[in-house]
């Protein structure tokens, strides 16, 4: 949770080379996967764990944990650990993240997200994507194609965190209180996205 918060803060601190505000304004959910790694122990070579929070009628939801694996994007990062961010930009993207498991590019359409001021003017993603994907590797933040990557619910870690089994949809729709340990992360997400709406 703390690692995901750090990734978000560092990426958003790069004012001219970050997620464009028009995308932040439309976001329905955000998934952050710190240090996605490449290794032979997973089919497809890539594996990572992260957290998801979704926008509700009264703010941002308590988080749940996810796993990401597979895909053919490893060549894009040179085999290095990389931080990933997935932004759901409409209700279809949100519905994908509510599923037990889905494949990017198959069950949900995705595109490499635009970055910075040039990305602010781009609207191509509105026509084609439910999810926008970003990576940060060795300090470089950019859109990345994650087609073929599977995203699944990490029920075990979520249960450990909450102390009881949780229904992911129930949590992400705002029906579960944010645990004290997750408040800084959720507050950070709300802060950055509120800034976007305020045009700051």
What does each of the following model-derived ranges do?
Residues 1-200:
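Small-residue-enriched, tightly packed secondary-structure blocks
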């Amino acid at each position: 949770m703390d690692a995901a918060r750090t990734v978000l803060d560092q990426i958003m601190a790069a004012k001219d080379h970050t997620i464009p505000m028009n995308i932040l304004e439309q976001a329905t959910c955000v998934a952050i996967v710190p240090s996605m790694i490449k290794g032979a122990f997973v089919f497809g070579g890539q594996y990572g764990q992260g957290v998801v929070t979704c926008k509700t009628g009264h703010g941002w939801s308590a988080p749940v944990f996810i796993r990401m694996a597979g895909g053919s994007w490893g060549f894009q990062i040179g085999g290095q650990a990389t931080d990933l961010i997935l932004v759901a930009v409409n209700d279809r993207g949100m519905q994908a993240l509510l599923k037990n498991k889905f494949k990017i590019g198959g069950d949900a359409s995705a595109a490499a997200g635009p970055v910075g001021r040039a990305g602010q003017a781009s609207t191509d993603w509105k026509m084609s994507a439910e999810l926008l994907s970003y990576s940060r590797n060795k300090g470089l933040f950019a859109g990345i194609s994650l087609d073929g990557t599977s995203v699944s619910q990490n029920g075990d870690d979520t249960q450990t965190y909450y102390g009881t089994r949780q229904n992911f949809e129930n949590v992400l729709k705002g029906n579960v209180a944010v645990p004290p340990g997750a408040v800084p992360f959720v507050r950070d997400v709300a802060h950055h996205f509120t800034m976007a709406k305020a045009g700051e």
